[in-house]
């Protein structure tokens, strides 16, 4: 049986509000995280991803209070990332109600964290987020700290390493496409999807429903993540699911 592909609305959170930017900059307020999460749950989203986008660069603590509030009202899986620096942070987020924990900058500075966390809590709980930008040599380079810090690492090779260390899923964001609404970087998505066996979530650049379908059909992603098209009422999750199902993509329709 073919696994259904997933639609995952993404809530970028800073200072307790949901925001959306372009190329990781120019942030615009999109609303209250608890209200928005509840709306997506009602619309039939498969999961919700929360990213505290300035926790690492600001050195702030985890957004446990928001996660507890959302988890008490939302009954689909929650992935939470931002500011995860230690195995104990993973524990605290899971205890607050997260189903999966995203690790990004800390996976670079301390790859052992991915191994230790997946050993303790299971690979199914650990999502490694990779923010990648096209380099002049044609590769994709990994960036950290909300896209502000270049690492010199090749995104495809890094995804392989993270799989080997125990990541259960890769959340792959094209920084070049983030917020641009011109579609996923399908070459990047396909290159990573073909290189690893764990699920890849495509992120960055969705401007319409065809972009979501292309992420799966062309990019070979297992799930597609979007923010702007859902936050500002351009489309609902149900519309997106019906559109993808009409193109022959297996979806969980509610």
Curated annotation (Swiss-Prot):
EC number: 4.3.2.10
Active site: residue positions: 12, 131
Coarse class of the protein's main subcellular location: cytoplasm
Gene3D superfamilies membership: Aldolase class I
Keyword Ribosomal protein: no
EC class (word): lyase
Assembly: Heterodimer of HisH and HisF.
HAMAP family: HisF
NCBIfam families: hisF
Protein name, per record: Imidazole glycerol phosphate synthase subunit HisF
Organism: Janthinobacterium sp. (strain Marseille) (Minibacterium massiliensis)
């Amino acid at each position: 049986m073919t696994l259904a592909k997933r639609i995952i609305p993404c809530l970028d959170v800073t200072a307790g509000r949901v925001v959306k930017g372009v190329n990781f900059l120019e942030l615009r307020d999109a609303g209250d995280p608890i209200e928005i999460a509840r709306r997506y749950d009602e619309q039939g989203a498969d999961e919700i991803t929360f990213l505290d986008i300035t926790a690492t660069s600001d050195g702030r603590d985890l957004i446990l209070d928001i996660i507890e509030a959302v988890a008490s009202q939302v009954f689909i899986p929650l992935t939470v990332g931002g500011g995860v620096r230690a195995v104990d942070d993973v524990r605290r987020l899971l205890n607050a109600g997260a189903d999966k924990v995203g690790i990004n900058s800390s996976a670079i500075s301390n790859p052992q964290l991915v191994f230790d966390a997946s050993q303790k809590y299971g690979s199914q709980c650990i999502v490694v987020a990779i923010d990648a930008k096209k380099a002049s040599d044609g590769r994709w380079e990994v960036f950290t700290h909300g896209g502000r810090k270049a690492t010199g690492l090749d995104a495809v090779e890094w995804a392989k390493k993270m799989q080997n260390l125990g990541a259960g899923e890769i959340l792959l964001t094209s920084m070049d496409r983030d917020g641009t609404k011109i579609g996923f970087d399908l070459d990047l998505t396909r290159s990573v999807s073909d290189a690893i066996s764990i699920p890849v979530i495509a992120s960055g650049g969705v401007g319409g429903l065809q972009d979501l379908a292309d992420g799966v059909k062309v990019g070979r992603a297992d799930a597609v993540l979007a923010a702007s098209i859902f936050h500002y009422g351009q489309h609902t999750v149900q519309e997106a699911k019906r559109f993808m199902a009409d193109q022959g993509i297996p979806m969980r329709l509610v």
